[in-house]
Amino acid sequence: MELSLDELKLCLKPLVFFGELKLEISDYEEGKKIEVLDHDEGSLINLADQTINENYVCTTCNCTLYTNENNEVCFIEHPYGAITAVNKDQVIHLTKLIGAIINTDEEDPVE
């Protein structure tokens, strides 16, 4: 399976819960590191003192894909400490990316 960055983002959409999906791609010793981020910003009410934070920004890393020199996904880091009935479908979905070739040469993936 070969995927563009846009297609990869569509595959990873189920991992985003609060904001928008962002990919951060960097080089690492054997290939590419692709961080899958859930980025959210806006206003947030602090329930403790009823103040409003107008500049709320939260970015969480939902998983990281590592490719080899051929851009083939060979390793995935994920936040699942345990696989349960609640997250098993996401884990199965994510593991299907092992062996996929990711075209990381695109300039700007669609957000």
UniProtKB/Swiss-Prot annotation:
This is SPbeta prophage-derived uncharacterized protein YopW. It comes from Bacillus subtilis (strain 168). The gene is yopW.
